[in-house]
Amino acid sequence: MHPFSRLFRNIQSLGEEEVQELLGPPEDALPLLAGEDLNHRVADALNLHLPTADLQWVHKTNAITGLYSNQAAQFNPNWIQPEFPELHLHNDLIQKLQQYFGPLTINEKRKLQLNFPARFFPKATKYFPLIKGIKNNYPNFALEHFFATANYLWTLWEAGILYLRKNQTTLTFKGKPYSWEHRQLVQHNGQQHKSHLQSRQNSSMVACSGHLLHNHLSSESVSVSTRNLSNNISDKSQKSTRTGLCSYKQIQTDRLEHLARISCGSKIFIGQQGSSPKTLYKSISSNFRNQTWAYNSSRNSGHTTWFSSASNSNKSRSREKAYSSNSTSKRYSPPLNYEKSDFSSPGVRRRITRLDNNGTPTQCLWRSFYNTKPCGSYCIHHIVSSLDDWGPCTVTGDVTIKSPRTPRRITGGVFLVDKNPNNSSESRLVVDFSQFSRGHTRVHWPKFAVPNLQTLANLLSTNLQWLSLDVSAAFYHIPISPAAVPHLLVGSPGLERFYTCLSSSTHNRNNSQLQTMHNLCTRHVYSSLLLLFKTYGRKLHLLAHPFIMGFRKLPMGVGLSPFLLAQFTSALASMVRRNFPHCVVFAYMDDLVLGARTSEHLTAIYSHICSVFLDLGIHLNVNKTKWWGNHLHFMGYVITSSGVLPQDKHVKKISRYLHSVPVNQPLDYKICERLTGILNYVAPFTLCGYAALMPLYHAIASRMAFIFSSLYKSWLLSLYEELWPVVRQRGVVCTVFADATPTGWGIATTCQLLSGTFAFPLPIATAELIAACLARCWTGARLLGTDNSVVLSGKLTSFPWLLACVAHWILRGTSFCYVPSALNPADLPSRGLLPALRPLPRLRLRPQTSRISLWAASPPVSPRRPVRVAWSSPVQTCEPWIPP
C-alpha cells in the first residue's frame, strides 16, 4: 500500500481528483510530489512549520528530557564492584600466535604491533589539582561515593591495570612486567634490579657510608656536636685539597673501613641496639597503640612529631601481617598484602611524619585522631580507637620501574555509574579524559568504520548455527607504554581535603591543626564512616589517604581506545577465520561471533578458541557466552537467513515513546534530538526510512520547537508498526540502466529502450531519482546502473520531503552501480533519441562489506598444515565454504 494513501485522504486541502493523481502511476505522480507548492500545502496541513508565536516549550515527555531538565544521577549504596582476573597478555604474543595459527599476514602484524604496547602522546596535556580527582556527582552520598571510587581504583591497581605513583620518577604496580618494562626496572619482588644497582653503585657508596658514619657517631656519643663534626669534615677537606687526589681516596677508604668496623664490632644501628647487620633495612613494626601524638610547640617548625612510649617498648616487635578486613559484609573483599607502618625505637625522638610524593611532610589523619582526645560524641576518635592497627598509609607493588617526570596532578576525574541501563546493581568506573577531545589542543583520533546495517546483512545473514563470545574487561587487556603515564593520571585527594572542599570550613582561616581536623566530626560523617567501616574494615584508613595512579592498560575514556580494541579483536578474528575457513568469525569491539553449519562443529571450534585464548592471556566471559541457534542477536538486531530486523525491546520502546508524545504542544528541540536518535535506530526498517523524520531534522537544525500534529503522529505510528527486514545483497550483473535530463528520462535494458518527458523542468538530481524509481517500478530489477552520485549515495534527505518518502518506498532493497555518462546506454533515450540496441556494459555488483577493520579477506590455510579440529570436519575440505 502507498505510504501516503491514508495521509493524503485525511488532508482536507487536497481534492479527491488530486489525491487520485498523486496516488496514480509513478510517471505522473513522482514529478508532482517534487513540486514546491504541494510540499508547502501538506506541511501546512500537518502543522510541520516551525512555530512563530512565543509559546512555552515542553521540556519533558515520558523519560525524554530536554533543556533545563537534567536528569539527576542515582547513586546505589549497594553497588557491587566487579572483580578483575589477572589480565596479562603473553610477553611474546606475536610469536605465540604464530605457533597456533601459523605465519601472520602483514595486516595482522600491523594491528597487533599497534596494541603491543599502545602509545598515546598528545600535543598538550592539562594538569588539574588532586582535589578534582573524584568528581562529586552525588552530593547526597558524597562520602560513600568517595570511598567506593577510591576502592575501585585500588582494585584496578591490584589487578595490574594501574600504576601507583611513588614519586616524580618511579611507579609501582602488581603483576608481571612486560618486556618494555624490563628496561625500566628498579625493583622486582623486593630485590633491586641488576642494571639499576650497577648504575647507582659508584654514586651511592660514598653517600651511604657517610650517612651511616654520621648516624653511628651521633648514637655512640650524644656529646659530640654537629659543629665539631662539621669542623672535622672541613679539616679533612682542607687537607685533601692540599695533598691532592690521593689524600681524597685515602679519606674515602678510611670511611669505608670505619664503617666495616662499626658493622662487625659494635653492631649499633639506626634506631635499634643489638641488631644483626641483616636487619639494617628490615621494616620495624610496632603496635598502633604504642604511638603517641605530640605537637612541636615551636612556631618555626610547622610539622608534627611522633614519640614512642618507653613503657610499652617491649611489646613492639618486627612482623608482617596481611591486610585483612574485619568486615562482615561480602561486598568488597579484595586481598591486600600490606605491611605495618614503621615506628621509631624507644627513647629516641624521631620524625616519622609521612612524606607525600613531593617530599612535603603530611600528617596521617587516622593517627592524629587516635592520639587526640575526643571532641564530642560524634568524634572520629571513637572509630579510630576501635582498632589497634589500621595498617600502613600506602603500599608498594611487586615491581617498581622508572618513568618520565610525573607531576603530582591528575589529567582526568573519575566517578561511578551503573554498569548499563539494564544493570543497576553493579558499578562501572567512568574516566573523564575529555580534555583530549576538545579545544585547540584536541587529538584527532584515527577513524575506523563501524559496520552498517547492510554490511551486517551481507556478512551474517546466513543459515548457520551462531555463538557469541564476550571478552572480559576487553580494554584492560591492551597494555600501554609507561611513557604515556603522565598523560593518563587519576587519583584521590584524601578524605580531609575532599571533605574540606565540601563543607563550609573552607572559609575558616584559623591555622589551628586540631580545629581543622575536628571539622570532620559531624553526625553525618560519623554515621557514614561507621557504615563504611562495616564494608571496608581497616582498609578504610588506606582509602582515606591521597594517591595518584596512572593507567598501565588502555582506559575507556580516551578516543584512541575503541580504535585499538577494534584492531586487536579483528586481528584475532582474522587468524581464527584463516584456520577455520568453513566457519564465520566476526568481531566488533569486545564481541566475537562464531558461525558454523552444525552445532557439533561449532562446539569444537569454541573449545579450541577458548583454550588458545586462555593460553594467550585473553579472558572470555563465560557467563555471557550465548548459543543463539539460527537466530543471531547481535548489536541490537536479530539476524536470520531472511534478513535483519531490530530486537523486540527496541520496537516496544519506540512505540511507547511515540504514544507518549503530546499533540499540539511545542516540544523543546533537545527532546526532538533524543526522540530522533531513538527513531533512527529502527528507521531503515520502515517504508519511508530516514526521510519520514525530515521535519524533526529541520527543527533541530534551526534550534526551534516542534509541534506534533495528530495526523503526523498517527502517520509515524503506522510506519513504525510495519517493519520490513533488510536483506543481503546478491552478486548479480547489471542489466537495467537509467538516466535523465531536466526535461526527460530514459531507461535501457537488454531488450528494449524507454523514454519520456516531464511536464515541467526539474533539477537534475531530482530527475535522475525519478528515472531510477521508474526503472525499478517497470522492470523490477534490484540492481540499477546510473551516473548520478547523489542517487548512488542513497541519501534522500536532500530531496523534497514527499518525493524522498515515496522514492525510499520504491527503491527499498535496490542496489546501484556507477556507469560513466559516455558508457550509459540510457543517455541517448533520456535526450529523446532511440538508437539501435547495443551490448550493455558488463557491470557486476560486489556485495557491500564497507572498508571496515573488523572484516578482512584472509587467505585460506595451506593444505599441508595439520587440521585444527581433532575429528573429521562435516564440511568437505576440497571445496571449502567461503563466507559471503
Curated annotation (Swiss-Prot):
Residues 185-387 are annotated as: Spacer. One of its GO terms (molecular function) is RNA-DNA hybrid ribonuclease activity. Residues 388-729 are annotated as: Polymerase/reverse transcriptase domain (RT). Activated by host HSP70 and HSP40 in vitro to be able to bind the epsilon loop of the pgRNA. Because deletion of the RNase H region renders the protein partly chaperone-independent, the chaperones may be needed indirectly to relieve occlusion of the RNA-binding site by this domain. Inhibited by several reverse-transcriptase inhibitors: Lamivudine, Adefovir and Entecavir. Keywords: DNA replication, DNA-binding, DNA-directed DNA polymerase, Endonuclease, Host-virus interaction, Hydrolase, Inhibition of host innate immune response by virus, Inhibition of host RLR pathway by virus, Magnesium, Metal-binding, Multifunctional enzyme, Nuclease, Nucleotidyltransferase, RNA-directed DNA polymerase, Transferase, Viral immunoevasion. InterPro entries: DNA/RNA_pol_sf (IPR043502), DNApol_viral_C (IPR001462), DNApol_viral_N (IPR000201), HBV_DPOL (IPR037531), Hepadnavirus_pol/RT (IPR052055), Rev_trsase/Diguanyl_cyclase (IPR043128), RT_dom (IPR000477). Mg(2+) binds at residues 470, 590-591. Residues 1-184 are annotated as: Terminal protein domain (TP). Gene3D superfamilies: 3.30.70.270. The keyword Transferase applies. The record marks 68 as: Priming of reverse-transcription by covalently linking the first nucleotide of the (-)DNA. Residues 398-639 form the Reverse transcriptase domain. Residues 299-345 are annotated as: Disordered. It catalyses: DNA(n) + a 2'-deoxyribonucleoside 5'-triphosphate = DNA(n+1) + diphosphate; Endonucleolytic cleavage to 5'-phosphomonoester. GO terms for biological process: DNA replication; symbiont-mediated suppression of host innate immune response. Coiled coil: none annotated. Hepadnaviral virions contain probably just one P protein molecule per particle. Multifunctional enzyme that converts the viral RNA genome into dsDNA in viral cytoplasmic capsids. This enzyme displays a DNA polymerase activity that can copy either DNA or RNA templates, and a ribonuclease H (RNase H) activity that cleaves the RNA strand of RNA-DNA heteroduplexes in a partially processive 3'- to 5'-endonucleasic mode. Neo-synthesized pregenomic RNA (pgRNA) are encapsidated together with the P protein, and reverse-transcribed inside the nucleocapsid. Belongs to the hepadnaviridae P protein family. Terminal protein domain (TP) is hepadnavirus-specific. Spacer domain is highly variable and separates the TP and RT domains. Polymerase/reverse-transcriptase domain (RT) and ribonuclease H domain (RH) are similar to retrovirus reverse transcriptase/RNase H. The polymerase/reverse transcriptase (RT) and ribonuclease H (RH) domains are structured in five subdomains: finger, palm, thumb, connection and RNase H. Within the palm subdomain, the 'primer grip' region is thought to be involved in the positioning of the primer terminus for accommodating the incoming nucleotide. The RH domain stabilizes the association of RT with primer-template. This is Protein P. It comes from Woodchuck hepatitis B virus (isolate 8). The lineage of its organism: Viruses, Riboviria, Pararnavirae, Artverviricota, Revtraviricetes.
